[in-house]
Amino acid sequence: MASSVLSSAAVATRSNVAQANMVAPFTGLKSAASFPVSRKQNLDITSIASNGGRVQCMQVWPPINKKKYETLSYLPDLSQEQLLSEVEYLLKNGWVPCLEFETEHGFVYRENNKSPGYYDGRYWTMWKLPMFGCTDATQVLAEVEEAKKAYPQAWIRIIGFDNVRQVQCISFIAYKPEGY
């Protein structure tokens, strides 16, 4: 019985050595990094490993006088050509264009639901009916112009509705009132 205990310990030692050789070497933030480190701790903060040379920082979106309207609303307003391109993309995917407008709160706020998340409690008013059967992007932009004339102080957005899956697939602001 003692021989069986001894042989199983020898087998366990051998398998540990084999496993250690099979593990890929550690690659840290710096090429000179090694794992595990067995040296005296250096409390000088200038010697702490830094990957700062490889990081490209992006400017944070300024929250002052910059309300958030929709996803990607921090980008500049879309030009007429860009709007036309977005609507053509919407139509190419077989989605139904629909215009909505909001006269009071075009930006994100919480009214009906106080918990954070995708749903923010806003309801936009639909401009006419969804444009079922529309195949021309200029028709959609003509409706945007008509909505602008009727409600010059409203936010107007274009959504793309997939009537097969019954979901909204795209949404973007087409017009913001002056001063926003």
From Swiss-Prot:
Q: Name one GO cellular component term.
A: plasmodesma
What superkingdom does the record give?
Answer: Eukaryota
The subcellular localization recorded is: Plastid, Chloroplast; Cell junction, Plasmodesma
SMART domains from the UniProt entry:
RuBisCO_small (SM00961)
Q: Name one GO biological process term.
A: reductive pentose-phosphate cycle
Per its UniProt record, what Gene3D superfamilies does this chain match? Ribulose bisphosphate carboxylase, small subunit
Transmembrane region positions? none
Q: Which UniProt keywords apply?
A: Antiviral defense, Calvin cycle, Carbon dioxide fixation, Cell junction, Chloroplast, Photorespiration, Photosynthesis, Plastid, Transit peptide
> One GO molecular function term?
ribulose-bisphosphate carboxylase activity
Xref: InterPro entries? RuBisCO_ssu, RuBisCO_ssu_dom, RuBisCO_ssu_N, RuBisCO_ssu_sf
Q: What is its main location?
A: plastid
Transit peptide stretch = 1-56, 1-57
Which proteins does it associate with, and in what oligomeric form?
A: Heterohexadecamer of 8 large and 8 small subunits. (Microbial infection) Binds to tobamovirus movement protein; this interaction seems required for viral systemic movement.
General function of this protein: RuBisCO catalyzes two reactions: the carboxylation of D-ribulose 1,5-bisphosphate, the primary event in carbon dioxide fixation, as well as the oxidative fragmentation of the pentose substrate. Both reactions occur simultaneously and in competition at the same active site. Involved in antiviral defenses.
Q: Anything further noted?
A: The basic functional RuBisCO is composed of a large chain homodimer in a 'head-to-tail' conformation. In form I RuBisCO this homodimer is arranged in a barrel-like tetramer with the small subunits forming a tetrameric 'cap' on each end of the 'barrel'.
Which family does the UniProt entry place this protein in?
Answer: Belongs to the RuBisCO small chain family.
Please state what the protein is called: Ribulose bisphosphate carboxylase small subunit, chloroplastic
